[in-house]
From Swiss-Prot:
Molecular function GO labels: copper ion binding; superoxide dismutase activity
Domain of life, per lineage: Eukaryota
EC category: oxidoreductase
Function recorded in the entry: Destroys radicals which are normally produced within the cells and which are toxic to biological systems.
Cell compartments where the protein resides: Cytoplasm
Cited Gene3D superfamilies: Superoxide dismutase, copper/zinc binding domain
Matches recorded under PROSITE patterns: SOD_CU_ZN_1, SOD_CU_ZN_2
Comp. bias regions, Basic and acidic residues: 65-81
SUPFAM superfamilies: Cu,Zn superoxide dismutase-like
Residues annotated for Cu cation binding in this entry: 45, 47, 62, 119
Protein name listed in UniProt: Superoxide dismutase [Cu-Zn] 2
Species this protein is from: Brassica juncea (Indian mustard)
InterPro entries registered for this protein in UniProt: SOD-like_Cu/Zn_dom_sf, SOD_Cu/Zn_/chaperone, SOD_Cu/Zn_BS, SOD_Cu_Zn_dom
Length: 152
């Protein structure tokens, strides 16, 4: 089994730990807890780069090895890194489990070394009608990020 982890921090006080697990060539399960967010939906994506030299702004666009448009996790036409939204409760904390087939921990499209990013606003999943809907999900600013590393 492949395992990965990302520790999220930000200057805005958002913190979290995200775990990734993949059995063989199967789907990857993402589990995590993120705190310090405003209640509601927040876009959640794997970004192309593991570069945090300028915080989350240097993590590049959504991970998109197949050159597709932005979409929902269940859409056939979507970025590999489009993981939808996490739901934050009234206490400012999100606890979640996501299973996805496009974010492997090994091989040419591995997400290891890339960044996971939490956004300020909901991801409209490519269906919002805004010009950014098909590129970023119009999910607003980047409020926290962490680099996905291998876990022993």
């Amino acid at each position: 089994m492949g395992k990965g982890v990302a520790v999220l921090n930000s200057s805005e006080g958002v913190k979290g730990t995200i775990f990734f697990a993949q059995e063989g060539e199967g789907k990857t399960t993402v589990t995590g807890t993120v705190s310090g967010l405003k209640p509601g939906l927040h876009g959640f994506h794997v970004h192309a780069l593991g570069d945090t030299t300028n915080g989350s702004m240097s993590t590049g666009p959504h991970f998109n090895p197949d050159g597709k448009q932005h979409g929902a996790p269940e859409d056939a036409n979507r970025h590999a890194g489009d993981l939808g939204n996490i739901i934050v409760g009234d206490d400012g904390t999100a606890t979640f489990t996501i299973t996805d087939c496009q974010i492997p921990l090994s091989g040419p499209n591995s997400i290891v070394g890339r960044a996971v990013v939490v956004h300020a606003d909901p991801d409209v999943l490519g269906k919002g009608g805004h010009e950014l809907s098909l590129t970023t999900g119009n999910a607003g600013g980047r409020v926290a990020c962490g680099i996905i590393g291998l876990q022993g």
